[in-house]
């Protein structure tokens, strides 16, 4: 028997669709505007969404190529954008891998092991995570200044020191992975132990394959966080060639001259590694969601 929808229900459905499209347009419009600015002549932040005379000059400069102006003069790239992009990918990738590794092993200890003070440590980790990183900038500078005297590759103006600083923000990820581990029946690991598996083998061969979705989520979130992080990176990095892209892009906004076109091209480039990582990790997300243990 066919169901007949009332007029009020149809209106609500249409209103919901209109609201969703409006919200989607609100999200997409700034991105389209940034892309338009990157193809617009000059360095103007205002103008039509479709440039009157599209140009690739801003993209050439961002990619490291010089451009020849109408009067014959040559304009070299003002900043090493591709170097900054590589720095961002390198720092983001290494940080995300280490964050996943540390968070996973820590979460396993909190989820499966019993030891004194476990709940207190978990609560303390969450409380400290609530304070923003900017409150600790002075302490971080003093810490890495002193640390660099003994371990140079972890000191100021080093990517190693920046990566080490990012590892301090794993508390939320530990809580997230811990909750996922606790949702997996421990009898699967017990069965593996009966078959002669060591705790490490049970963790690596049983628990980790079932936890791929949450590990992929943590990796993506960590990578995005590092790629877009500015306060800590701008504090610890002082050499222009060592900047990440998020920090280096600020160089385009001079008080005397705002290079909006070049800034927009660099901003679009900054989204490339994030998009690539998400598309690659999406395979693991979908594949991991269909994986599971069967007890019988």
From Swiss-Prot:
Record's subcellular location: Cell inner membrane
Q: Which residues lie on this side of the membrane: Periplasmic?
A: 36-88, 144-152, 228-257
Q: In this UniProt entry, which residues form the Cytoplasmic topological domain(s)?
A: 1-12, 112-123, 176-204, 281-296
Q: Which UniProt keywords apply?
A: Cell inner membrane, Cell membrane, Membrane, Sugar transport, Transmembrane, Transmembrane helix, Transport
Gene Ontology terms: cellular component = plasma membrane
Give the disulfide map.
none
Q: Which InterPro entries match?
A: BP-dep_ABC_trans_perm, MetI-like, MetI-like_sf
Location of the ABC transmembrane type-1 domain: 85-281
Where does the source fall among the domains of life? Answer: Bacteria
Q: Which GO terms describe its biological process?
A: maltodextrin transmembrane transport
Q: Which Pfam family is one of this chain's hits?
A: BPD_transp_1
Q: Which residues cross the membrane?
A: 13-35, 89-111, 124-143, 153-175, 205-227, 258-280
Question: Care to name a GO molecular-function term for this sequence?
Answer: ABC-type maltose transporter activity
Membrane topology classification: Multi-pass membrane protein
Has keyword Cell membrane?
yes
Look up keyword Metal-binding and say if it applies. Answer: no
Q: What does this protein do?
A: Part of the ABC transporter complex MalEFGK involved in maltose/maltodextrin import. Probably responsible for the translocation of the substrate across the membrane.
Subunit structure comment from the entry: The complex is composed of two ATP-binding proteins (MalK), two transmembrane proteins (MalG and MalF) and a solute-binding protein (MalE).
Question: PANTHER family, per this entry?
Answer: MALTOSE TRANSPORT SYSTEM PERMEASE-RELATED, MALTOSE_MALTODEXTRIN TRANSPORT SYSTEM PERMEASE PROTEIN MALG
Question: What is stated as this protein's family in its record?
Answer: Belongs to the binding-protein-dependent transport system permease family. MalFG subfamily.
Can you name this protein? Maltose/maltodextrin transport system permease protein MalG
Species for this entry: Vibrio parahaemolyticus serotype O3:K6 (strain RIMD 2210633)
Per the record, the gene is malG
